[in-house]
Amino acid sequence: MYLYKKNYYGYAESLLDISISENNVEKYINDCFFILSIIQNNQVLILLFKSHFIGKQEKFNIIDKIFSAKIEKILVNFLKVIAKNNLFLYYKQILLKYIKLANSHLSQTWGEIQTAFPISSVMTSSFESILSKKLGKKVHLRHKINSKLISGIRIIVDNQIFENSLFSELKLLKQNLKKHLITKNDL
């Protein structure tokens, strides 16, 4: 397992070197998020690309058909290399490692803003600005609808959670009630 980990980190580092040399790091980050989204929403692609019953050329054709018109050619070829070397099972780790390395290179970070309803890009930009000042680096937020929130927002950046939602208030109330009941039962 360690060998694979070392290999896919090497793939991510190589992709970073290429994106830096092309002065296109930000575009590659966005393309990586696009790839992650497409594959996440079409899990059958993972089975297809890791299958030994489907030929390499057929896999390459599928990659071309899905991604060629939407992402940088280098990234299309990068996906083909991963498929060719039977490492597609690790596509997510490779792309996430690239994003992490690229963000470090650009002195920025990415996070997720979750709401129970759609919000405007102006509001998202406002949160990005506030968090950038608070964290001391450029913050980019991707929006996600989370129906469990009921109302309010949750922002996750660098493993930190900033939350103000009815869901979190109910969760806190439940914990306090449990604590109160346990204390009352101990008397």
From Swiss-Prot:
InterPro entries in UniProt: ATP_synth_OSCP/delta_N_sf (IPR026015), ATPase_OSCP/dsu (IPR000711)
Superkingdom of origin: Bacteria
Membrane topology: Peripheral membrane protein
GO terms of molecular function: proton-transporting ATP synthase activity, rotational mechanism
Gene Ontology CC terms, in alphabetical order: plasma membrane; proton-transporting ATP synthase complex
Keywords assigned: ATP synthesis, Cell membrane, CF(1), Hydrogen ion transport, Ion transport, Membrane, Transport
Coarse class of the protein's main subcellular location: membrane
Keyword Ion transport included in the entry's annotation: yes
Task of the protein: F(1)F(0) ATP synthase produces ATP from ADP in the presence of a proton or sodium gradient. F-type ATPases consist of two structural domains, F(1) containing the extramembraneous catalytic core and F(0) containing the membrane proton channel, linked together by a central stalk and a peripheral stalk. During catalysis, ATP synthesis in the catalytic domain of F(1) is coupled via a rotary mechanism of the central stalk subunits to proton translocation.
PANTHER family linked: ATP SYNTHASE DELTA CHAIN (PTHR11910)
Assembly: F-type ATPases have 2 components, F(1) - the catalytic core - and F(0) - the membrane proton channel. F(1) has five subunits: alpha(3), beta(3), gamma(1), delta(1), epsilon(1). F(0) has three main subunits: a(1), b(2) and c(10-14). The alpha and beta chains form an alternating ring which encloses part of the gamma chain. F(1) is attached to F(0) by a central stalk formed by the gamma and epsilon chains, while a peripheral stalk is formed by the delta and b chains.
The protein's name in its UniProt record: ATP synthase subunit delta
Taxonomic lineage of the native organism: Bacteria, Bacillati, Mycoplasmatota, Mycoplasmoidales, Metamycoplasmataceae
